[in-house]
């Protein structure tokens, strides 16, 4: 059901892309006969496309949330009896069952559904972008499917740079969860009996949390600087490629809007790993903790 909903919403974006082309062609020549009537017709068409899209996306989010919680429930029901029946001492076991299972289920659902959307977007928009690659005024782009290949190369290059810039993030996220768990454990003991709290020890644990968080902030700052730069360049990039064709009369304003939208969709799908790198980093650290928990319960 979720995959079907994603497929339908992707097809709605395909219809919207075609709408962009015709609508902006109309705006390019507003003085044509019957222009105002056509404008209102386009507004009605937009509503016919956009409102079902919004409803379907809302339904998709609702069903995905239920799916993620049922996955969390299955993990919890699997781990609790095994934890109860073992004498193994596992650091932060309660956190791994309560928090890590919740975050693992949410992130897996979030990333998995996003990956399905990216694949379906590629299947839908690659033919459109390929067809729109004709009429290029830039000499080195005058070959079949040029815009598709540009989108692919820029996405692969961006992903490679993102991997290099964010290479230390998974380890730092894992260490962050460990230091937070150690601090939480001492605070829980103190909540039950204040006399059991050793203030210097708790403050030392907090300083460990502080040190790791500051390292994490620094590395995320590098990554976000690169990620934001890449995102902004990709917004303007298709217009840099197609602008000369517009001003030489090879294409219309509607076509350049279609290209900008289709290029963005394809590049975003190819750049899925870049856009979701922080979520993937978090998921990897959670997976590592749950894998350790699995081995301890074996």
Model-derived features with residue positions:
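Alpha-helical segments in transporter systems
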Residues: 1-19, 38-49, 60-65, 105-125, ...
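An intracellular "coupling" helix at the cytosolic face of ABC transporter transmembrane type-1 domains
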Residues: 103, 175-185, 189-237, 279-282, ...
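Short cytosolic helices in intracellular loops of multi-pass membrane proteins
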Residues: 71-88, 167-208, 267-274, 283-293
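Short helix-terminus and kink motifs of transmembrane alpha helices
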Residues: 14-22, 61, 65, 69, ...
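Transmembrane-helix motif of ABC transporter permease domains
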Residues: 1-12, 31-72, 141-164, 251-267
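Primarily ABC-family ATPase nucleotide-binding module
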Residues: 97-98, 294-298
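Helix-loop-helix
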Residues: 129-156, 219-287
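Hydrophobic alpha-helical transmembrane segments of ABC transporter permease domains
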Residues: 98-149, 234
């Amino acid at each position: 059901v979720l995959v079907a909903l994603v497929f339908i919403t992707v097809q709605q974006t395909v219809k919207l892309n075609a709408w962009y082309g015709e609508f902006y062609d109309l705006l390019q020549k507003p003085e044509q006969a019957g222009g105002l009537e056509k404008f209102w017709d386009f507004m009605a068409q937009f509503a016919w496309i956009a409102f079902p899209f919004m409803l379907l996306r809302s339904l998709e989010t609702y069903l995905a949330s239920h799916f993620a919680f049922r996955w969390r429930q299955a993990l919890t029901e699997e781990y609790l009896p095994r934890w109860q029946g073992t004498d193994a001492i596992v650091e932060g076991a309660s956190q791994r069952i309560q928090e890590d299972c919740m975050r693992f289920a949410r992130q897996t659902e979030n990333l998995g559904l996003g990956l399905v959307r990216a694949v379906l977007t590629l299947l839908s928009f690659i033919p459109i972008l390929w067809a729109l690659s004709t009429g290029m005024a830039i000499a080195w782009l005058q070959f079949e499917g040029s815009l598709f290949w540009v989108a692919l190369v820029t996405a692969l290059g961006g992903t490679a740079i993102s991997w290099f810039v964010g290479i230390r993030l998974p380890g730092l996220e894992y260490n962050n969860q460990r230091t937070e768990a150690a601090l939480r454990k001492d605070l829980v003991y103190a909540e039950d009996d204040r006399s059991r709290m050793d203030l210097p020890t708790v403050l030392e644990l907090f300083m460990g949390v502080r040190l790791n968080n500051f390292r994490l902030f620094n590395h995320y700052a590098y990554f976000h600087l690169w990620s934001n730069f890449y995102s902004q360049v990709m917004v303007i990039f298709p217009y840099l490629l197609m602008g000369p064709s517009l001003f030489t009369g090879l294409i219309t304003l509607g076509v350049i809007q279609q290209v900008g939208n289709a290029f963005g969709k394809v590049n975003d799908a190819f750049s899925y790993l870049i856009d979701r790198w922080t979520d993937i980093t978090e998921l990897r650290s959670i997976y590592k903790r749950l894998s350790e928990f699995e081995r301890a319960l074996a």
